[in-house]
Amino acid sequence: MHAFCLPGQESQLATTVAFLRAAMNFYQTHFNSYPFGSYKLVFVEELPTQRSDSATLALVSTDLLHGPDAIDQVYEARLCLSHALACQWMGINMQQKNWSDLWLVNGLGLYMTGLFLCKLFGNNEYRFRLKKDMERVVESDRGAMPPICRPNNPEPPDAAAIPFINLKAPLVLHILDRKLGKSGTSVGLPRVLNKIFLEGVVGDTNLYISTHSFLRICRKVSGVDLRTFADQWIYGSGCPKFGFSAVFNRKKMAVEISMQQECPAYIFHEKNDRSKIIHKPVPFFEVRQLHGFRPQQSY
């Protein structure tokens, strides 16, 4: 790995990229070997975008450079640079098969980045960022946003929808990881990714990934039927909203919990058949049954 900057910025460069070796080791340990022979990071002034990625090379804005006394800027810089490195695996070496699979490539790259940042900053920081992202998705996905995957649409996603796709996709993959992990086989999404990257080493034909093939590999590795999950979270739009209430039943000496689910996106399109066909809002998300529990006696 090599990093380049303009003269006079060497000290900030060393501080900014000091963690990249740990990121490379993490990705290679969990997601197979690095797919290229080298990696260069170039900090450029007045770059039109914050970052531009290509094979073995990432152009990054000098605004991300920081000294050892920086606090808030550290997370943004490490998020951007670790994501740039993850894109070498998913996004550059392995690409989407169709435009409708863009959510998967972008989401997997961000999911890999999130796992590394969880190790780097700790589980509390990771869950805090996850919670904030969930709140933003819930506020946005109320009927105006399309599904993150539209297989029958050959056109690329609208530019205004891409930030939302990049926000929701890693959260959907996080839910999928939890679903696979609770299947009883102790198989999570990292193992599925490792298998995907391992198959990509065989030949160029395996360097294009589709939503269908990804779900097929997940089902093959874990044995979990993901059709309902895919229809709700991938091919459908909207997010569930839950309301809970609790009542103490004196006769049964138990707390009875009732749960009510609402889907704002479905309510938004309920009276418009045409928009329901386009946006595919989910009327009801699958949930697990909650059972009452007996309180502990106190003496």
Q: Predicted regions: what is each one?
A:
Residues M145, C263, K280-V282, R294:
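Intrinsic-disorder/low-complexity coil detector
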Residues L290-Y299:
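Solvent-exposed beta-strand/loop surfaces of large extracellular or lumenal domains
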Residues I267-V287:
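Short coil-to-beta strand junction motifs in C2/discoidin
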Residues A3-E270:
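Hydrophobic alpha-helical and helix-loop surface patches within well-folded domains
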Residues F164-L167, F284-H291:
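Short, compositionally biased segments
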